[in-house]
Amino acid sequence: MKIRPYQTEDRDAVIALWDACGLLRAWNNPYRDIERKLGVQPELFLVGIDANQRIIASAMAGFDGHRGWVNYLAVAPDKRRLSLGRQLMNEAERLLAERGCPKLNLQVRTGNLEVLEFYRKLGYVQDDVVSFGKRLIHDQTQA
C-alpha cells in the first residue's frame, strides 16, 4: 500500500470506503466533513492506495496544538488483517510527532470490540475520561 495525502478526485471513493466500513452516520455529512478537513491541515488527510490505484484505506488526522486526533480510520473489508491500518496509524503518528504533538487521542464506539483491540495492540490505552459532545452545526445527510 502506498500512503499519500487525499486529493479532490478521491472524494467518492473515500466516502464509499467509509460506507463499506460502517463509519457513516446520518448526523455526520461525509461531504461536509471532507470540505472542513480540506480547510484545516489537509496534508494530514491520508489515503492508502493499492497497485491498481484503488483507495483501500483512509485516516483523517489533525493537531490542535494540545492533542492530536485521528478520525475516519478505515481499511477496505477485503484488505483487513494485512497490517494496513497499522501502517496508516504509524504514518499519522509520524506526521503528528513532526508537528510536536505530545499525545494522540481517538474515539471508538464502545461496542466496536474488534477496533478497540486493534488500538490496544498498537499501544493505545483507555483514558479515564468521559467524552462529551455538543452539536454546533446540524448537517445531517440527505435521505
Feature roles, as predicted:
Residues 106-115, 133-137:
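Conserved beta-strand-loop-alpha-helix junction that forms the acyl-donor binding cleft
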Residues 1-2:
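Extreme N-terminal starter segment of soluble prokaryotic enzymes
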Residues 5-72, 76, 90-91, 95, ...:
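Acetyl-CoA-dependent GNAT
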Residues 119, 124:
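Conserved active-site tyrosine of GNAT-family acetyltransferases
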Residues 69-72, 107, 118:
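Residue-level recognition of specific faces of alpha-helices
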Residues 76-78, 82, 110-111:
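Active-site acidic-Proline motif in GNAT/NAT acetyltransferases
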Residues 79, 83-91:
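Conserved acetyl-CoA pyrophosphate-binding loop and the N-cap/start of the following alpha-helix
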Residues 96-108:
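Conserved GNAT acetyl-CoA-binding A-motif
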